[in-house]
Amino acid sequence: MNANTPTPIDGQPTELTPSTQAALEPANHAPASPGATHIRSFVHRRGHITQRQRDALEQLMGKWAIPYAPRPLNPATAFGREAPTILEIGFGMGETTEKIALARPEDNFLGVEVFNAGVGSMLHRIETSQIPNVRIIQHDAVEVVRDMIAPDSLAGVHVYFPDPWPKKRHHKRRLLQPAFVQLLASRIKPGGYLHCATDWQDYAVQMLEVLGGEALLENTAQDYAERPAYRPQTKFETRGLRLGHGVWDLIFKRKA
């Protein structure tokens, strides 16, 4: 078997509606008391799904997706090779993940997304573009990082354009809170990186504060970084920049 040829993932397609449990509790913990708040990587939203996306979910989950399980994932087994693993949280419709994975065939990309339309779109991209170095987990990202990613194991993490929750009363729902950043940092190997991007300025300010306050991380720039060549500019981003909107990249490295 060629080192770049993936080993098919055994098992049936994962449940399409992900479970959500207490975000930073151990997997075998008892449920929190009613009314307690938890960091979650998503909220349930009803959305349109195309027939092509539906077909991909039905036909390709067993080939390219990894079922959530409350135990550490073995990337070499999942991808069929030993290679640096990059975690992509919230890949949306998969346009950026597809381009990055094709441009960096030497790396493995583990994409985490909860919404059916996005997962179906990414599965279709993997199959039609023949991208052997991408796997998908359809589940809450916080639980995946907590339960399935071993400490000091990731070469990098990408969090591009997470939900900004623009209303002030909803800021507590934003993904990049200190507890989750601390968890992410613990899963990145020394020398690895955490790359975030947002087009909401006040979220960029919060990201800079939260990432800068994490003891395991150090900023690679004085504040915000230039967009690196490996992160492609999306159509939405291009349109926003043309209209005068800003985009902020933050790249932090895990300290040795």
Curated annotation (Swiss-Prot):
Highest taxon of the lineage: Bacteria
EC numbers, comma separated: 2.1.1.33
Residues of the active site: 163
InterPro entries: SAM-dependent_MTases_sf (IPR029063), tRNA_(Gua-N-7)_MeTrfase_Trmb (IPR003358), tRNA_methyltr_TrmB_bact (IPR055361)
Annotated positions binding substrate: 167, 199, 234-237
Residues given in the record as S-adenosyl-L-methionine binding sites: 88, 113, 140, 163
Broad EC category: transferase
A Pfam family it matches: Methyltransf_4
Alphabetized SUPFAM superfamilies for the sequence: S-adenosyl-L-methionine-dependent methyltransferases
The keyword tRNA processing is assigned to this record: yes
Coiled coil: none
Catalytic activities: guanosine(46) in tRNA + S-adenosyl-L-methionine = N(7)-methylguanosine(46) in tRNA + S-adenosyl-L-homocysteine
Gene Ontology CC annotations of this record: tRNA methyltransferase complex
Function: Catalyzes the formation of N(7)-methylguanine at position 46 (m7G46) in tRNA.
Name of this chain's protein: tRNA (guanine-N(7)-)-methyltransferase
Source organism of the structure: Bordetella avium (strain 197N)
UniProt gene name: trmB
